């Protein structure tokens, strides 16, 4: 068995996990998340803990047990605490404004860039150069953050652009004459 797949998930109070034939649902204060069930993994619930076991001895089933376990763990953490990504805007005149699930970016183009947030994702701007994306689904939060970053990725000569708050940009040396 995979090392990740062996570890049980403790279900905190206030979280309801339902295991059906075709999907696993996790319901909590942060919302409801669903995951399609894989036939290679057996899910066993007992005493407030979830255990994941490979359905057979194949290598694929072993790997999938760890993957499904981590996805369900992310769902449990998402509906209890939630996930967030922080982005910073670096550049003269670069600013962001959030209102009514829309993000307005002014990042050096001749027009502002408007991005609509999907259901379950909230966006806030603490300062005009900081963007905070929050939600229960870790994958969707990361995907939206990547899409916002792709509007103006950091360039390697001056470092201007949209970057993750913990991202380090290696600045290149300019061409010598």
Curated annotation (Swiss-Prot):
Pfam families: Ribosomal_L6. One of its GO terms (cellular component) is cytosolic large ribosomal subunit. GO terms for biological process: cytoplasmic translation. The keyword Iron-sulfur does not apply. One of its GO terms (molecular function) is structural constituent of ribosome. InterPro entries: Ribosomal_uL6-like, Ribosomal_uL6-like_a/b-dom_sf, Ribosomal_uL6_a/b-dom, Ribosomal_uL6_bac-type, Ribosomal_uL6_CS. Gene3D superfamilies: Ribosomal protein L6, alpha-beta domain. It comes from the Bacteria. Keywords: Ribonucleoprotein, Ribosomal protein, RNA-binding, rRNA-binding. The keyword RNA-binding applies. This protein binds to the 23S rRNA, and is important in its secondary structure. It is located near the subunit interface in the base of the L7/L12 stalk, and near the tRNA binding site of the peptidyltransferase center. HAMAP family: Ribosomal_uL6_B. Belongs to the universal ribosomal protein uL6 family. Part of the 50S ribosomal subunit. PANTHER family: 60S/50S RIBOSOMAL PROTEIN L6/L9, LARGE RIBOSOMAL SUBUNIT PROTEIN UL6M. NCBIfam families: L6_bact (TIGR03654). This is Large ribosomal subunit protein uL6. The lineage of its organism: Bacteria, Pseudomonadati, Pseudomonadota, Betaproteobacteria, Burkholderiales. The gene is rplF.
